[in-house]
Amino acid sequence: MTTHHRVRSSSNSSSNNINNNNNNNNNNNIHQLSSSRTMIDHHNSDPTSSSSPTNESQIHHFSNSNYNYNYDDVDDSTINSNSTNNNNKNRNIQNNNNQNISNNRDNNNNNINSNLNNQTNLINYNDDEDYDEDYEREIEDDEEYEEIGDEESSSGIGGDSEFNDSLNGSKAGSRNREIWINPNIELMLKIALSTTKNPYYYHNIAKKLEEMVGRPISEKLVRSQMTNLLGKNSKFFKHPYREIKSKPGIPKSLINSHNLREKQIWESCKNLITEIKSSPNYYSIGGGSFPTNNNNHNNASGASSSTSTPSTSSASSPASSSSSLSSLSNNNNNNNNNNNNNNNSNSINNSNNAHSIYPNGSNSGNSKNSSSSSSSSSSNNGNCSSNYPSPPLSENHLSLSLPSISKSHSNNTGSFGFSLSSPTTSSSNNSSNNNNNNNNSNQFFSSISDQQPSKKLHVVSPPLQSLQSIQPPISQLNNNNNNHHNNHHQNHHHQNHNHQHHSKKRKIRSYDSKHLEKFQVIREKVIETLSEIDDIINSMKNDSDNDNSEFEDC
């Protein structure tokens, strides 16, 4: 009976060990399972041994008839019951282990699939926007030019797997690798050429490319590819593509067709890159800043330069492309003023001393339609009007109605009645100056009208006789003041215009009223000085008359 007790206690202790180990560590259950099934065997005397054989070998061990067991003093029913209990427990433990293993396998598969999806969504080709421009560092990378949207091959041509494998093998061993042209890169460039420039430029390209290739394309990848292709130090032209030489096992016709196709794709991509750089939609790819209203602004400039935004991949002529480039560059430099017109009356500091810095209505008909100016001036009967692109009309000072200035050419009379809303108020001040034949005498007052749109100037003109008697000094004074004022306004306008291109909202700082007050004080001083000079002249005339009378008396 001692043996019977030993077997029962051994089986119980082994089952307890199994239950404890099942709660602590599932991986050790298999080993404990093996030890529990060998406890009846006299060859294994240690019930806690963890170095027992596996389940498969242990099952084979029990099925082997060569082993002899000494169970003479052991109750058969006890052995059967213990083995049945152990088998049930072992079966439950094995089921739990299998379930845990399958769950872990499913989790691992899910993690692997998610990682693969992330890797395919963000294809690792220069994903870092601040990538190093050094080509030697780029050579060390595993892939020079990763596929966009094509999972079949990394050679960029698709098709025969054997051919692609041989190409990949040859590419991996080359140090002076050249870029493999990807047909999807050509597709991306075509989409980029037809995509309108706006803050969602890369996003729109990525979405269109995603629809074309049928798989997710990240916006970051498109940005890095476009930066590499259109960047200042683009390696696309330095290392365009590699011609495949004869290789064993590859038909020569297939190699020739590959080389021909690669060359054709590269030529197409090169033309597309040139066209993108010369199109109105092109901007500095590496900058990353987008003016908010740049789209409509450049559409207006493009319309004036006979170059339309291309909607397909067909290339425009170099002449039209260069004209659109000059249109874009000159629009920023000329500040929407007709400074490049042949007629000097429309420039800022013109020889005719026009009434304001805006295009003069009398001579604006002679101004030519230049692609360098996005604001075209047109007027009739002396009224000045300018047409500007749509974005600034509602947000900056260009939307304000310009002062209406009437000018008669028959008697060369300058009238300086100004108004912000209607030209009718100019007639109220014209009556006092109809006999004034000098245009320069009114420029000083008319130049003030452009600065304070919310106020009207009620000019009190000096005596007409005094104005006519001292025209040369006043003309010099007004010329100096007008030139100084125009230069100041030009600089002020230039600064504000540059600020508008780099800000989200087109706002302009309101003109300080102190300037207007200064002009008013100067005007009053001038009028006072004129009256004093007029008095002196009158007194001199009186003295001369008296002298003449005395001479006549003699």
Swiss-Prot record:
Q: Name one GO cellular component term.
A: core mediator complex
Return the annotated region ranges for Disordered: 1-127, 139-173, 293-395, 416-509
Q: Where is the composition biased (Acidic residues)?
A: 139-153
Organism, scientific name: Dictyostelium discoideum
Q: Looking at the record's lineage, which domain of life comes first? A: Eukaryota
Listed Polar residues bias regions = 164-173
The entry's protein name is Uncharacterized protein DDB_G0281497
Task: Cite the record's Low complexity compositional bias ranges.
Answer: 9-30, 46-55, 63-125, 293-387, 416-449, 461-484
